[in-house]
């Protein structure tokens, strides 16, 4: 649970530490829930170039790494697409198989075009205006990363 956009961003930074090349993160949440804010934290931790904003109209922002031997970040907002077939028609499904980290806002709209082993994040509104509840689901075989992330959140490891 976070109490501010800054806290949501900080969770994104911690989350980046368990991501690997070719990871796909499917994000869901209502408009204004904090999906782009979370991506900003991931981008900061990955040390990529450019300001993070929602690619609502362009559908995809590719943030190249600012340093050698780092991963690019593929940031999608698929709200305007008509489903998995539209995602494939644009060739976006191929990007998820390239080296890099892929985060997809409104990812439930294109779930059928994604690999089975995606990490899922649902962001919902909490009991007050700034409170957000973040629920992560790691796929089978990645439980150890989910546990490491939980321990990071709890401050047990750094």
PLM regions with names:
Residues 35:
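Conserved lysine of the Walker
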Residues 85-87, 93-158:
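Short phosphate-coordinating micro-motif centered on Lys-Gly-acidic
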